[in-house]
Amino acid sequence: MFARSALGRSDQLVTALNSQKRQFVLTAATTALGSLLFSEDNRLASQMEKGLLHNKNAENSASIPNTANKFFSRPEAEYPGHVPLYTFEKMLMFLGSSVGAYTHPERNEFIVALGESTAITPVLRRLQHQMLSDPVGRQILRERPRMTSTSLDLEHLRELPDNTIGKTYVKWLDKEGVSPDTRVEVKYIDNEELAYIYQRYRECHDFYHAITGLPIIIEGEISVKVFEYMNIGIPMSGLGALFAPLRLKKSQKERLYNIYYPWAFKSGLNSKPLINVYWENILEEDIDEFRKTMGIEQPPDLRNLRKEYFKKLKEAKKIV
């Protein structure tokens, strides 16, 4: 019993010593921290009294650029209608319009957004250099023509001889039920001249349909896009050539891969640069001579091929 009592007192003594030790360490740490704080306060107070602190901070603040404001400030518009975008906004527009254009290719707003979000500066600079290296291209950049039903005078074009470029163009417009007035203004490309170059490409698209005779149905659009990509190099046209056929039926893919892709590759590569064609000045020229001069072969009539296919399909069903 005596041993247990002695052992208990010993444990109490150890506990008390440990408690005192912890209290001592805590007190010492608090004292040291307080000393550092007071020392820092004293040092700052001394600098303030000598007039050193404020001068130093003023110099530092004047020398540090306001990078935060620069990063978050939106650039000013470079031309009427221009909408400057941050890089992450352009990426979001690209992703959203890519999905939209694939799932709903009939919706023009997705096609427009995808086209501008992929019209990267190096591609447009290459087209700019191509135009500046050609006398007609330089004339286009200098005069900045715009294509509308008024500027093209569609009524006059309807009176031209059948084999002229102008008559071929307006007949294609009437047959497909489209108008040059439907082309949307470019607004997301940051440089004013590059924006015009892309606008010019966009407005000339219907001429590429007209001179090749390809309709605005999905197969015709894809074929023209491949032709454009091989000649002009607009990225969206290449994306369309890769992904648009994935949604098509087997018969449509076969026509594209066996007939129209080979034609588009050959004609697009062999043709002179389409971006340098001043269409407004050659509307009364012979279209066959134009195709020959440019190096463009006319593809088989897509609508006739489709009619023949459906006719054979119908006859096969009757036989079965």
Curated annotation (Swiss-Prot):
Pfam families: Coq4. Its EC number is 4.1.1.130. It is found in: Mitochondrion inner membrane. Keywords: Lyase, Membrane, Metal-binding, Mitochondrion, Mitochondrion inner membrane, Transit peptide, Ubiquinone biosynthesis, Zinc. It is an enzyme of class 4 (lyase). The keyword Lyase applies. GO terms for biological process: ubiquinone biosynthetic process. Its main location: mitochondrion. Pathway: Cofactor biosynthesis; ubiquinone biosynthesis. One of its GO terms (cellular component) is extrinsic component of mitochondrial inner membrane. Residues 1-31 form a transit peptide. Its cofactor is Zn(2+). Transmembrane segments: none annotated. It is a peripheral membrane protein. Zn(2+) binds at H205, D206, H209, E221. It catalyses: a 4-hydroxy-3-methoxy-5-(all-trans-polyprenyl)benzoate + H(+) = a 2-methoxy-6-(all-trans-polyprenyl)phenol + CO2. Belongs to the COQ4 family. Component of a multi-subunit COQ enzyme complex, composed of at least COQ3, COQ4, COQ5, COQ6, COQ7 and COQ9. Lyase that catalyzes the C1-decarboxylation of 4-hydroxy-3-methoxy-5-(all-trans-polyprenyl)benzoic acid into 2-methoxy-6-(all-trans-polyprenyl)phenol during ubiquinone biosynthesis. This is Ubiquinone biosynthesis protein COQ4, mitochondrial. It comes from Scheffersomyces stipitis (strain ATCC 58785 / CBS 6054 / NBRC 10063 / NRRL Y-11545). The lineage of its organism: Eukaryota, Fungi, Dikarya, Ascomycota, Saccharomycotina. The gene is COQ4.
